[in-house]
UniProtKB/Swiss-Prot annotation:
InterPro entries named in the record: E2/EBNA1_C_sf (IPR035975), Nucleotide-bd_a/b_plait_sf (IPR012677), Papillomavirus_E2_C (IPR000427), PPV_E2_N (IPR001866), Reg_prot_E2 (IPR033668), Regulatory_protein_E2_N (IPR036050), Regulatory_protein_E2_N_1 (IPR042503), Regulatory_protein_E2_N_2 (IPR042504)
Region feature (DNA-binding domain): 295-376
Keyword set, alphabetical order: Activator, DNA replication, DNA-binding, Early protein, Host nucleus, Phosphoprotein, Repressor, Transcription, Transcription regulation
Principal localisation: host cell
Name this protein carries in UniProt: Regulatory protein E2
Signal peptide residues on this chain, from the entry's feature table: none
GO molecular function: DNA binding; DNA-binding transcription factor activity; nucleotide binding
Gene that this sequence comes from: E2
Subcellular location: Host nucleus
A Pfam short name: PPV_E2_C
Length: 376
């Protein structure tokens, strides 16, 4: 027990030295969070051994030290990844890398240079609320977990930043408008400027993803053109024209279907009807065909993005032989930023996946979804 007390004293002495140093280097902040991990691990072990005091220090309950250790691990891993980015040599203080800053909206990223944004609901100064707009935000890409710096923005709708062609709102003024206001309108005061409801552009402020896709070559006439043509036609002419357009659309759909099937046959031989049924999106529970050699067993891990990254990091360094490949953290594009993320694990066989589930303990809060995916 004396050794435990000495280690705890040495750990806390090093932390005090860092506090007095007040460094703005990222490596010192990483050291600080490493020491916090060690401190909570020692306190956890002391409590496990039945100690309630170490010298004059009270040993917290196991649940408290466990939660603090998890928080320290999460921030420590995030800072280690940040050190490998292009922003490692920027000034990083204890305040910039604190757990409070990590949890401040938007959660799970680093922020700097905050300014105050005042929102007056109903245009009434007595109903004003203040928010923080971060001029610089450091977020991770969903595709490769690489850190990038993006500017914080403000619109009539709320506070947001643009990442991977998507506007991500972390404060929506509409949510507070029904609490602090009555008319559902407000004014945004920032940097000596005022944003009114009349200046709100719902198109440019709407959160959306720009994804490449096929160019639409439909021959459908725009609604305005149809209205102009229909005004000069009689009922019989309208019916004949609509029948002709409908027949043309059916031919286009049939031609598109045939060309898709022929392309599949050219790429992979004869199209298997059973394989086609497996890819039927109308089925709630698709079943893998036993004779299909092109499907690999997978596990989709669903949960908090940061928890998934920490869990994947532990798997990569301790259980790498129990799975074939792992994906980066990803989300469905139609879901909001607050929705859960996914990490997909690939396996060479069902036996390997079963062994993984028998050996690896999945942390609470992470959902395991079994499935199969086409090998590519």
């Amino acid at each position: 027990m004396e050794t435990l007390a000495n280690r705890l004293d040495a750990c806390q002495d090093k932390m005090l030295e860092l506090y007095e140093k007040d460094s703005d280097k990222l490596e010192d902040q990483i050291t600080h969070w490493h020491l916090l991990r060690v401190e909570n691990a020692l306190l956890y072990k002391a409590r496990e051994c039945g100690l309630t005091h170490i010298g004059h220090q009270v040993v917290p309950p196991l649940s408290v030290t466990k939660a603090k250790a998890r928080n320290a691990i999460e921030v420590h891993v995030a800072l280690q990844q940040l050190q490998e980015s292009a922003y490692a040599h920027e000034p990083w203080t204890l305040r910039d890398t604190s757990r409070e800053m990590w949890d401040t909206a938007p959660k799970g990223c680093w922020k700097k240079r905050g300014i105050t944004v005042e929102v007056r609901y109903d245009g009434d100064e007595s109903k004003a609320m203040c928010y923080v707009q971060w001029r610089e935000l450091y977020v991770q890409n969903y595709s490769d977990d690489r850190w990038v710096k993006v500017p914080g923005k403000v619109s009539y709708e709320g506070l947001y930043y643009t990442h991977e062609n998507m506007n991500i709102y972390y404060v929506n003024f509409k949510d507070d408008a029904c609490v602090y206001g009555e008319t559902g309108k407000w004014e945004v005061h920032v940097g000596g400027k005022v944003i009114h409801h009349d200046a709100f552009d719902p198109v440019s402020s709407t959160r959306e993803i720009s994804t490449p896709g096929p160019v639409c070559t439909s021959n459908t006439t725009p609604a305005s053109t149809q209205a102009q043509v229909g005004a000069s036609e009689g009922p019989e002419q309208k019916r004949q024209r609509l029948e002709a357009v409908d027949g043309q659309h059916q031919q286009q759909r049939q031609g598109s279907k045939d060309s898709t099937q022929k392309a599949a046959e050219r790429a992979g031989g004869q199209v298997d009807s059973d394989r086609t049924r497996l890819c039927d999106t109308r089925s709630a529970h698709p079943v893998r065909h036993p004779s299909d050699p092109d499907c690999a067993p997978v596990i989709h891990l669903r949960g908090d993005p940061n928890s998934l990254k920490c869990f994947r990091y532990r798997l990569h360094h301790g259980k790498r032989k129990l799975y074939s490949r792992s994906s980066s953290t990803w989300r469905w594009s139609c879901e909001s930023e607050n929705q859960a993320a996914f990490v997909t694990l690939w396996y060479t066989s069902d036996t390997q996946r079963t062994e993984f589930l028998n050996v690896v303990k999945v942390p609470p809060g992470i959902q395991v979804i079994l499935g199969y995916m086409s090998i590519f």
